[in-house]
Amino acid sequence: MKEAYIVKAYRTAVGKAPKGLFRFKRPDELASETINHMISEVPQLDKTRIDDVIVGNATPEAEQGLNIARVISLMGLKVEDVPGVTVNRYCASGLETIAMASAKIKSGMAECIIAGGVESMSFIPMGGYKTVPDYGIAKQGKEDYYWGMGLTAEQVAEQYKVSREDQDEFALNSHLKAVDAISKGKFKSQIVPITVEETFLNQNGQKETKNYSVDTDQGPRKDTNLKLLNKLRPVFKMNGSVTAGNSSQMSDGAAFVLIMSEKMVKELNIEPIAKLVNYAVAGVPPKIMGIGPIKAIPKVLKQADMKIDDINLIELNEAFSSQSLAVIRELDLNKDIINVNGGAIALGHPLGCSGAKLSVQLFSEMRERKSKYGMVTMCVGAGQGAAGIFEFLK
């Protein structure tokens, strides 16, 4: 089996949706500008040698339709030789693409692939424009297949006995860690600044345009505290415990990695950053989809012949406080190595981008801590879990 090495990894900052900093930036623009920056750092690579662009996206329709991966390839690489394919495993889409690219290179089916994800929840709302559940499935008593994510978070909170107080405290810590990380410049080296052009009518009714650059995650709040979080009302269930404050944010963002074969790495004299050791997905009941990592993490560890104690850092996607705490408690995970710079509750969750975004963040922190093994894991809508183990090489 050949080796597949991650040699570059970048992301955009994450903007709030639907009225945040990227509300005027199309997803294909976000992604193509990120890829363009990443490839510019490897001038010795002939772009026509890239075998594929694999893009994760959770809602591939409208501005994210038309096989957005191919659109991104054309816009970002500015050559017609490189194909593109869009992949949807919902919240795990970005991580799935890294696994697919690594597997193709290891098997000899490719030498160089761009993998990652993009999501604009400003342009495409949660669930898309027209979700039509199968009436026959609902008739069979399986309506939970289509439950909204918030309702599943309530179910997890109830089943795993996660209190409102614990959820709010977890959310607060996510913001505190993220604000601290930003103040220390921890994300600067991984973020590609994106220029946004905003056109509007001024007070005189005249058309004006202004440009601004986005290089900092928009979500983390310095002013949040437990008192404010405790005041928020449940939004998914009467007398529930899941609020806007202890749930992940709707977001816009893009993240990508460049993966090469060992042969190409040597030929181009490039120093690898990391490699994917193993990847696993698992199915769980849709009504408690948030527990997905409880099944996926042991599975990937077994495949890799590793133990949880071998993992030095974990990026656990914080879809909701309730499910994050359920996973941590059920698997008895070490809280000190999880989301050390904050998670999706503070930093945002741009669905199909998140798996790649968390991987980029993981590599950056592994470099700083000189860690050897790291993990990216998340729950996935409709009852799935995903987990990937990375080895840091630099």
What residue spans do the PLM features occupy?
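N-terminal extracellular/periplasmic Venus flytrap/periplasmic-binding protein-like
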Residues: R11-A13, F24, D28-E33, Q44, ...
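Short, well-ordered amphipathic alpha-helical segments that serve as non-catalytic structural scaffolds
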Residues: P27-P43, I68-I72, T97, M149-V156, ...
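Conserved catalytic cysteine-centered active-site region
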Residues: K25, N57-E111, V132, D144-L151, ...
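Active-site-proximal alpha-helical scaffold in enzymes
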Residues: N88-V118, A157-K186, F256-K263, I328, ...
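Condensing-enzyme catalytic core mediating Claisen C-C bond formation in acyl metabolism
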Residues: M1-P27, N225-I291, K295, K302, ...
